[in-house]
Amino acid sequence: MLLLERWTEPLAESNCYLLGEAGRAVVIDPNDPRGPLERLEALGWTPERILLTHEHCDHMAGLEALRNRWPGVWVAATAACSAGLGDTRLNMTRRMEVYLAFRGKPGVSYPPFVCRPADETYEHAWECVW
């Protein structure tokens, strides 16, 4: 049976979606280095695909943690998103502390970081055969 779970990252309150069946999973917007990874392990799911909707840090902060834990996972994103993963201005890590302060969470340390580009890019549509 196909199961869809949502993980809400508590700091920026962004969502990650885990879609899984029979031990396999697709991850959409891995927003946190620990939460989605721990949930995937608890469910016994191995992510085969990660889909990024855009490059902002609150949607990809857990990307490298998942890549390091499951080196065979395949990442798909638009070409613009893929390029933005490696740019602290575009992925918003340079401004995240200010954003969080405006959201009522002042004083939070959020060091800038970058991620490796996507394995596959697309422009308008992505077809996932899974």
Give residue spans per PLM region:
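Active-site HxH/HxHxD metal-binding segment of metal-dependent hydrolases
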Residues: 13, 32-128
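Structural motif
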Residues: 21, 129-130
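Conserved beta-strand hairpin/beta-sheet module of binuclear metal-dependent hydrolase folds
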Residues: 1-45
